Amino acid sequence: MQLSTTTHEQATLVNQKDTYLLIVFDSAGTAVLVESQGNEYHLPKIEIPKFTRPAQEVTELLRNVWKLSSVFLFSGVVEESANASYFAVLESTDGLCLHPQGIEWFTIHHALSSLPFSKHECRAVRLSHAKLRRRIYKNSSEPFARLGWMQELKDWVDSNIRPLGMELRSLQQLNGCETFSLVRFATTQQPVWFKAVGEPNLHEFSISHALRKFFPRYVPNIIATKYEWHGWLMSDGGGATLDETSNPLAWQTAIATLADLQIESIGTIDDLLEAGCRDLRAPTLLELVDPFLDTMAELMNQQTTVPPPVLSRQELSHLSETIKDALQCLSALQISDSLGHSDFNPGNIIVGPEGCTFIDWAEAHVSHPFLTFEYFLSHLRKDYPTVVPFEDDLRSSYARRWQGCSSAEHVSEAFLFSPLVAVFAYAVAGNRWREQECVKIPQVPGYLRSLTRRMKREAEMLQRRRVECPN
């Protein structure tokens, strides 16, 4: 769930750029690409749009502009540099004969000992090369921070799809770091996808396999599993993502399919929790209300500017009572806990001719089902204005499914209490609020305070709705 931003703020974010120094090694790890201008030598520097996937943006830029095939290995923050914010380490898979104009290959030793690099460039190359050398062994806990892993992956994918009558054609690296990878492989038939996860999302590996076991109709088919990388190869969903269409029927189909999945999941709650789904059921949330709001009281006292308003202890106390009441009322309704998703956004919903499939379950949880519907609405209101007029139709589609196993009155009441509970559950789900190191990050306290103010607004609207519709 993301808070709304103004059109001006959105336009500003779209136009912002991140600057990256590129450290491109050859596949043997013996040479690095260096840009030369007369007697000056520097690491190449590029800009990519802010808030995008660096692995995808950087590798596509190198392919389209430099005509160079590359693999994104890892990235980091550049220290003591006013000219770049980050560095990206890549492997060129085209050999030493290919390089863009004005950029040459130099041996690592020569580059570090003889070229007039700046201090931060020299440090970045030296540390990156040392990191690659430490990751030579294949049993590393960081499998994607080493040279040659993509070729190994291609061979593994090829060996698993050939028996299915498919052959590899090309690949697109969409996301990645030392422990995480997302690669799309084009084949002679439909595409296949490889995904691997590490901490803090290691649970997605077991969750994805559990969902495939219990609900194969709703998730992509898993073709093969690479256990040592916590990765799996899956088939394509066979359609477009929901965010690519404004057809209200497609959106209604997606939300009705979500309800079907949730209803089917009711009998598998223990299995889902064992697989790693987060427990956001009412008893768990009730225990977190006071600890969370006590922490928010401390963060409110740290706020130095007004507006936005600082919530008083008394306001937080009233909010605590309202959240607890909403949780108790919601759990009293005859609607069972089910599978849910704290980031249920249209980009993770694939709409095909035979129905919908859902991908990316890192934020899977077990909770009251209507919380997931609220997260879906939050994305819709923020990013899809052309679909907002159909919100009532979506609500009706979702409600009709649940009225098959609960009364219409209980479904209506669940819609009353779920907006407030959804914001609270989202705020406490990741435990960032009680991790001292996390709270020290400048943006985190402000974000948590904004979520708390959002809860207060939802609590006030809940009280008004209960007065207007007492029955």
Model-derived regions, located:
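N-terminal strand-loop-strand
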Residues: Q2-P44, S70-V71, I350-G352, T357-D360
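ATP-binding pocket architecture of kinase catalytic cores
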Residues: Y41-L43, E80-S114, Q172-L280
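Active-site acidic catalytic loop and adjacent metal/ATP-binding pocket
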Residues: V34, L171-T188, W193-F194, E321-F373
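A cross-family kinase active-site recognition segment
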Residues: T245-R313, D337, P442-S450
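The catalytic Nudix box helix
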Residues: L43-V77
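Active-site activation/catalytic loop segments of kinase-like enzymes and analogous catalytic loops
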Residues: P369-S406, P419-V439
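Active-site catalytic-loop/activation-segment of kinase and kinase-like phosphoryl-transfer enzymes
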Residues: K131-W149, L153, G276-C329
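Juxta-kinase regulatory segment immediately upstream of eukaryotic protein kinase catalytic domains
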Residues: P116-L171
